[in-house]
Amino acid sequence: MQSSVFAFKITSTSLEYFKQRSFGIIFDVFNSMNSCENELVKDYVCNIGNEEFYESLKYHNDLIYSSILTKNHDLLKDFFIWKYSVYSSRNIDVDCFLQEYRFWKESVLNHLYPSHANEINIIYDYLISNHENFKINASKRKNIFVNSEYQDLFGELLFCLLNSGKNEFYSLVRRNLNKFDNDIFLFTKELIKPLMYKIGQMWQLNEISVAKEYFATSLIDEIINDLIKENFFEDSNNPLVLTSTVGNELHNLGIKIVGKFIESHGFCVKNLSSKISNKELINSIYVLKPKLVVLSVTLPSNVATLQEIVKELKSDLNLFSGKIVIGGQGLFSTEKIVSIEDADFCSRNLEELESFLKNLR
């Protein structure tokens, strides 16, 4: 792919104008696509419906903004490969995206000064020139790693999750926890994490419905939460840690598990609601003054929001003087880590987080 040699040359001024005028830009692309006579475009919009289409444009815009802000090419590349894979699996001809990119370019030109628009539109020239590469890479199924020792159990859990009820899945998990010395964190690492990836991939490839994907992830969330609560108890006398997802995240099981893991290492953990606004999150941190804040992003489109929150928290030591740890799948979509300025530590897994916690105490 050309991403290794592609360099962002977009000024902060151009990026700020792009952010400020994003609503108008998105709205124009939405209208242009809906009135387009291109048969591929008409088929695409008709198949997914206006609501999903508009949400996809907003996600696209947030992802572009996050990629530029963090100067991370892989965020951009990986998202579009994923997008092509999703819609190809739904029998949509992804050549329709070429026309969409042209509409984005036109809309950016209409809403920004020419010099700023030309900088932003470098991105769309890149997308157009890499269109065929995205198609090729989207056709390759990504292997999900499962420890060979647990392959059979993984298959059994997956089948039970998709074909049985809550009680059967719960019993299966219970019966096999002893293989992990009843360590729910190890069980989650070896089986639940790849299981969640597999469910997501099956939805992506149109092998299961949205409803089935939602049921499966909700069931995993409920059962793992119950098992964790059975084994850990909060001590309010311990140093305070605040945990939270950032942005419009749909799943928060990961950050809940991280919170209980931190709690098991002698901290009092408060997990803030996934529906909390950025302002409410920051104000809560200022009021509670925790020793540590742990922030997670699953969706790459929320990386920019994470960067902005971390930057604000670190801007005044009188308001917050604690440490900030960041993590989540959205930061590790490739072998490269998405860099977030001013964060004290970026954790890939519980082992890395454990090392950080030992030094913190």
Task: Specify the residue positions occupied by each region the protein language model found.
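Peripheral docking tails and interdomain loops at the edges
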Residues: 327-361
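Cofactor-cradling patches in redox/metallo enzymes
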Residues: 263, 271, 276-336
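Short helix-loop-beta junction
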Residues: 256-270
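Core of compact, soluble alpha-helical bundle domains
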Residues: 1-82, 88-102, 109-178
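Residue-level detector of anion-binding/catalytic polar loops
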Residues: 268, 291, 344
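Long amphipathic N-terminal alpha/beta scaffold segment
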Residues: 175-252
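Cytosolic, long alpha-helical scaffolding segments
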Residues: 90, 252-256
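Alpha-helical scaffolding segments of alpha/beta enzyme cores, especially the outer helices
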Residues: 215, 222, 257, 283, ...
